[in-house]
Amino acid sequence: MATIANPRDIILAPVVSEKSYGLMEQNVYTFFVARDANKTQIKIAVEEIFGVKVASVNTVNREGKRKRSRSGFGVRKATKRAYVTLREGSDSIDIFNGSVA
């Protein structure tokens, strides 16, 4: 397990999609994370950056899409997403209205 000193190297960006907006009402937040980060590192990073208590972390590895261009085929880079559920009674994360990052 590689130790990453800075938690901002683990949490890369919030995911902006209809699904992620809908999940925020249920206290579930979605982030792009480093491909080599594990669930424990993600939990610690979210708690340090946003000052909240995390109940669970679910991760999804997404393979890069194959895309065609004029010169042939290419592949978008693969990503890893983390669905972070906060504990009951924990403060919500104001991702899109504040300058936390």
Curated annotation (Swiss-Prot):
One protein family per Pfam: Ribosomal_L23
UniProt KW DNA repair keyword: no
Keyword Disulfide bond: no
Keyword set, alphabetical order: Ribonucleoprotein, Ribosomal protein, RNA-binding, rRNA-binding
One GO cellular component, as annotated: ribosome
Molecular function terms from GO: rRNA binding; structural constituent of ribosome
Biological process terms in GO annotation: translation
Xref: SUPFAM superfamilies: Ribosomal proteins S24e, L23 and L15e
PANTHER family, per database record: 60S RIBOSOMAL PROTEIN L23A
Function: One of the early assembly proteins it binds 23S rRNA. One of the proteins that surrounds the polypeptide exit tunnel on the outside of the ribosome. Forms the main docking site for trigger factor binding to the ribosome.
Family: Belongs to the universal ribosomal protein uL23 family.
Quaternary state and interactors: Part of the 50S ribosomal subunit. Contacts protein L29, and trigger factor when it is bound to the ribosome.
Name used for this protein in its record: Large ribosomal subunit protein uL23
Origin species: Corynebacterium efficiens (strain DSM 44549 / YS-314 / AJ 12310 / JCM 11189 / NBRC 100395)
Gene behind the chain: rplW
